[in-house]
Regions:
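Unchanged
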Residues: 1-100, 109, 113-119
C-alpha cells in the first residue's frame, strides 16, 4: 500500500525504525512535474524523538521544528527565481534558519493549513 511505502521510505531515507511510526493521517496526493513523481504524503507520529540515520544520496539533513514554529505566518516566505526563463515567486519555509522549498514546502503548507484550522 502507499502507506506502507511511506513508512518504508521513512526508514530507508532517514533511518527511523518502522515499528515506532504510527500513521495518524494522510495529506493530498500531488504530482511533481520536474521529477515526474507522484507523492502520497502521510503524517506519522512517534512517542519519542526517533533516532535518525540519513541516507546521504536522498536527504541532505534532518532537523526538528516545533508545531508552533511551523504554523507561524512569518516563517512562510517567497523569493524570486527563474523557471523556463520566467521570473516566478517561489514559496518556501524559513524554519530555524533552514530553507524548505519545493515538494516538501507544498506538503508542509497543507499540513500547516490543517493545523491552523484545528485551533
Amino acid at each position: 500500500s502507499k502507506m506502507n511505502a511511506a513508512i518504508r521510505e521513512t526508514n530507508e531515507e532517514i533511518g527511523v525504525d518502522r515499528d515506532v511510526i504510527k500513521i495518524i493521517g494522510n495529506l493530498t496526493p500531488l504530482y511533481i512535474p520536474v521529477s515526474n513523481f507522484h507523492i502520497s504524503p502521510y503524517v506519522g507520529w512517534t512517542e519519542e524523538k526517533p533516532h535518525t540515520k540519513v541516507q546521504d544520496a536522498e536527504v541532505k539533513r534532518v532537523f526538528s521544528v516545533s508545531i508552533n514554529d511551523l504554523v507561524l505566518e512569518k516563517n512562510l516566505k517567497t523569493k524570486k527565481d527563474f523557471f523556463s526563463n520566467k521570473s516566478v515567486k517561489v514559496p518556501y519555509f524559513d524554519l530555524n534558519g533552514e530553507t524548505v522549498w519545493g515538494a516538501t514546502s507544498m506538503i508542509l503548507s497543507e499540513f500547516k493549513f490543517i493545523l491552523r484550522n484545528m485551533k
